[in-house]
Swiss-Prot record:
<feature type="topological domain" description="Cytoplasmic">
    <location>
        <begin position="777"/>
        <end position="784"/>
    </location>
</feature>
<feature type="transmembrane region" description="Helical; Name=10">
    <location>
        <begin position="756"/>
        <end position="776"/>
    </location>
</feature>
<keyword id="KW-0325">Glycoprotein</keyword>
<feature type="topological domain" description="Extracellular">
    <location>
        <begin position="510"/>
        <end position="511"/>
    </location>
</feature>
<feature type="compositionally biased region" description="Polar residues">
    <location>
        <begin position="344"/>
        <end position="355"/>
    </location>
</feature>
<feature type="transmembrane region" description="Helical; Name=1">
    <location>
        <begin position="407"/>
        <end position="427"/>
    </location>
</feature>
<feature type="compositionally biased region" description="Low complexity">
    <location>
        <begin position="84"/>
        <end position="98"/>
    </location>
</feature>
<keyword id="KW-0762">Sugar transport</keyword>
<feature type="modified residue" description="Phosphoserine">
    <location>
        <position position="263"/>
    </location>
</feature>
<feature type="transmembrane region" description="Helical; Name=6">
    <location>
        <begin position="567"/>
        <end position="587"/>
    </location>
</feature>
<feature type="transmembrane region" description="Helical; Name=12">
    <location>
        <begin position="817"/>
        <end position="837"/>
    </location>
</feature>
<dbReference type="GO" id="GO:0051119">
    <property type="term" value="F:sugar transmembrane transporter activity"/>
</dbReference>
<feature type="modified residue" description="Phosphoserine">
    <location>
        <position position="336"/>
    </location>
</feature>
<feature type="topological domain" description="Cytoplasmic">
    <location>
        <begin position="709"/>
        <end position="714"/>
    </location>
</feature>
<feature type="modified residue" description="Phosphoserine">
    <location>
        <position position="860"/>
    </location>
</feature>
<feature type="transmembrane region" description="Helical; Name=4">
    <location>
        <begin position="512"/>
        <end position="532"/>
    </location>
</feature>
<dbReference type="InterPro" id="IPR005829">
    <property type="entry name" value="Sugar_transporter_CS"/>
</dbReference>
Amino acid sequence: MSGRDNRGAGGGGGGGGGGSGGGHHHHQPLSSAMGKLKEKLTRVGDDLGYHRVESNLSTSNTATSLDTILPEDPFLFPQEAPQRHPQQSPSQSQQQQRRFLDDEPPLSFRPLLEDDDINEPPTQQQPQQQHQQQHRSPLSASGSLELTPLPPPPTTLEPRDRQQRSIPGEDLQRSKQSLKGSRVSFEKTNSKQAAESSDEDSFEDKRIGFQQQKATSVDHKGILKDLKHILANDNRRQFQAKKHVSLDVKGTRFLQDLLKESSSEEEFHKTRREFQGRKHQSLDPRVTFKLDKVLQGSSTDSDEEGDDAEHKRLIHRPKDITKPVIIDLKDLESESDEDFLTSRQHFQQQRSISTDSRKSRRLYEMDDMGNKRGDNIRHAVPFVRQITEDGKPKLEVYRPTTNPIYIWTQVLAALSVSLGSLVVGFVSAYTSPALITMTNGNITSFEVTPQAASWVGGIMPLAGLLGGIAGGPFIEYLGRRNTILTTAVPFIVSSLLIACAVNITMVLLGRFLAGFCVGIASLSLPVYLGETVQPEVRGTLGLLPTAFGNIGILLCFVAGTYMDWSMLAFLGAALPVPFLILMFLIPETPRWYVSRGREERARKALSWLRGKEADVEPELKGLLRSQADADRSATQNTMLELLKRNNLKPLSISLGLMFFQQLSGINAVIFYTVQIFKDAGSTIDGNVCTIIVGIVNFMATFIGIILIDRAGRKILLYVSNVAMIITLFVLGGFFYCKDKAGIDVSNVGWLPLSCFVVYILGFSLGFGPIPWLMMGEILPAKIRGSAASVATAFNWTCTFVVTKTFQDMLDVIGSYGAFWLFGAICFIGLFFVIIYVPETQGKTLEDIERKMMGRVRRMSSVANIKPLSFNM
């Protein structure tokens, strides 16, 4: 009986005992025994083969299931070999086997792709493919698979049904899952070579050798080699510990080579910046940016051509479309430099992760990949984490400025508005020296009664109250700069009215107009400086108006000793002229432009203040965000906005500082310095004492300028409070001993002057300038104009009350009672500062506002999130 007839007539035992063949009944017991042995060996062989494949997969570098391309043992699956007649010799069987293999049709293979049905069971219409899957051999030298010749079975076995030669359904399903994305080419078996394999051990040796071979993907093997080399390199770890390197691991290697080959650190930094400026690649080594247009021609030196070529080789690996790709970046490929930079920045913002981090190591750990058994990497380690725009609680509005030209533009702006403060100081101190000559009938052509003299000193604070109320709408609708500018001409007019006065009415009218301008200026000057000066110098430049105000007071005291009230008024009319000229040179605040929707004007103002070469876009974006937040929460009624809970706290702190500033008695001391020294019986001339007080006030302000950005606001307020408390109680004790106890104090006549000097020194360090400075810092942007108006009006109200009632206070409770009352108020103010006043040193206005209002507003993103910084 021929082999073909035996295959057709034999009864098949699918997985169990052997079927009985036709015709040779004397071999039936032997066939039954061999069938059972064959069934057992089949089960053992299947389990052994798959266990080996699975154990090898756990440590394999590829995600390809090897069991689908292993040749099946013809001893375990004898139906694959041509059936040999029991009486045939081995040589005849081998010849018949060669003819069987030669008669087989050509084998055709194709890669198993994603769209293959993994649940498709083997059918009878697929015998050729099933036959191919069971006869695959180890890889050839070219990377393809060849069919291995099958040795003839050692004994005579009954044939099986041809329909049962396929792999079981569950094994085929697992094999197809693991082969997804892989690309394997196959070649037809060489029939002559197949006939040369005759012993049983060759199959086991070849299968073990095949399983021990490395990954079939040359590209993947190269990437793994590079990654393992980088991760195991101690020099790279030491390099990364000192420097912040690129996210791209191949870029890291490139930077390390640059560092080794650079002759100096400066050359390395230059080359690194050029490299990072044109290249930022994904962590995934299989994702490639098209950077040919950027990289070509970027290196001109012959020494760098090798590094450039190596770098191009690393980032331009050949792609295999059948391999799984973690992220598809086709949408990020740009056609222009601008689009490329935008796409790169967008990609960088999706994920910031260091190549040396634990998560990055896990991404490339082959054990983790093997344990997933062919799953896509994106399911094992997430690669992209979407971040929201509000992910980073930080606003990058201000940046430190070190270029002197940037500082001097801000100094010019501060100096210009400070000249207005000099005029304010001169006008405020005018009554102290002027009333001495104004009440002299020999000098003045009109009569000045004591009551009229009291109104000359007291009407200015009252007018300042009205000016502070009107100044709020002015700075919102006219602008900060324009509001300050409009006070220059009225200052000149008011001084001319006083200088040319022929009656007391003209003097009072001039003082009222001057006081109105003082109220507006005292409101708008701090707001302007707070919105134009950077945090690094805001404390120092913010005290310039106070310093120039003290200069104006000192100038008035000194000039008053040599001039009468009329000539002193003419001097006051000349001081606003340089102030008027300089105000035309400085710009409006960028914040006001932003509040009016004039973004381009705001950009130009920032460029003027920060310098033409400065990058003002981050600061401008911060201003736009702040204004957008303010617009969303703003109401139509501005005054009702002040009463909101979030706005009430900063407004209350500002009002409290103004209250304790004026109730410390400073204006009473300044306005009535000469009279106080006369009442003290001091042997020193009153005008000289006034000049000494002015000099101390001026010098103390400059000490505060030096310390305010070093020690902080609250420390200076503590020192100021303690100094005023001690001196006021000592002065009260001095006047009590002199007026009430009748003790002779002539031997301590120097004590009032000493106490006044320490008192002025303490006031000028803290409570003099800081309330005005913090008014421009702690008030929220959306209510800054109206809140500053209320605070200024409250300050001038307190000034008017103290100045107008100080003489009456002396009559009722005496000098000692007045000073003790002021000292007690300062003692309460110390606890107010400790409990409620925040420290604003070195903080941006947005940071201060968030802290004061007790909420977190929408922030800029990572981010901001800032794209990855390559500063080392």
